[in-house]
Amino acid sequence: YITDELTDYTLQWLNDERDSKKPFFIYLSHKAVHANFDPAKRHRGQYSDAEIKMPDSLADTPENYKGKPMWVKNQRNSWHGVDFPYHSELNVKEYKRQYNRALSAVDDSLGRITAWLKANNLEENTAVILMGDNGFMFGEHGLIDKRNAYEESMRVPLIAHIPGAKQNYVVDEMAANIDIAPTILDIAGIKEQPPQFAGDSLLPLAK
């Protein structure tokens, strides 16, 4: 399973190829949480009894589409819409369950890596940042997938463990993916940012 395999590669590098005398940087990008969602065998059937509540904005009513562009309603019966998703008879609720099942392996991956950091006394000397590269829609506004400017499509999780920073703390200020590289350099003590970087370090918000 690709999520497990990528995690294995990461741990193999940490164990066998990392120079323990130098700082290290790892970028691990999981793929199985991209459509079509294919969970690991151990997670198949997970959440089968879980209730999936569809969003109120899915409703095909005049009130729901009041003030919205015509293309939003028109896309209901399209590749991006809940009435003909991916030009198929896809069950959007089951699709969401499949997504959650695939995501469970990412939870396992993060657990294995953080356990390695703890076992090697690096937990409090290593920053860990978990984020997505896009949102996803499961019926919101009558749509599926991504590729539009609704918040469900644009917003992504951003969770960070940074030694010395506040714990269990939520930042309300706007942050964007262009801020991640400057933040990593700041954590590493590199204050001079390359001129092509358009973002700002988020580290001051966590202190």
Residue ranges of model-derived segments:
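Active-site-proximal cap/lid insertion segments
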Residues: 1-5, 11-22, 27-177, 187-196
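Catalytic core of tubulin tyrosine ligase-like
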Residues: 180
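Short, intrinsically disordered, charge-balanced linker/junction segments flanking boundaries
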Residues: 196-207
